[in-house]
Amino acid sequence: MTDTTGRIPLWLIGTLTGILVIGLIGIFFYGSYSGLGSSL
């Protein structure tokens, strides 16, 4: 992990993107399961 060229590391971007995607999918499925996703 020494490939830090002054920008944000690629693994950090991938990790944050994965967490956001999993969170959005989880919220979407939880909302549809609770009956709140029908308004979306």
From Swiss-Prot:
Topology within the bilayer: Single-pass membrane protein
The keyword Transmembrane helix is annotated on this UniProt entry: yes
Keyword flag Transmembrane: yes
Pfam families: PsbJ
Any GO BP: photosynthesis
Entry-linked Gene3D superfamilies: 6.10.250.2070
Transmembrane segments: 8-28
Any one annotated GO CC term: chloroplast thylakoid membrane
Quaternary structure, from the entry: PSII is composed of 1 copy each of membrane proteins PsbA, PsbB, PsbC, PsbD, PsbE, PsbF, PsbH, PsbI, PsbJ, PsbK, PsbL, PsbM, PsbT, PsbX, PsbY, PsbZ, Psb30/Ycf12, at least 3 peripheral proteins of the oxygen-evolving complex and a large number of cofactors. It forms dimeric complexes.
HAMAP family registered for this protein in UniProt: PSII_PsbJ
Name the UniProt record assigns to this protein: Photosystem II reaction center protein J
Gene of this entry: psbJ
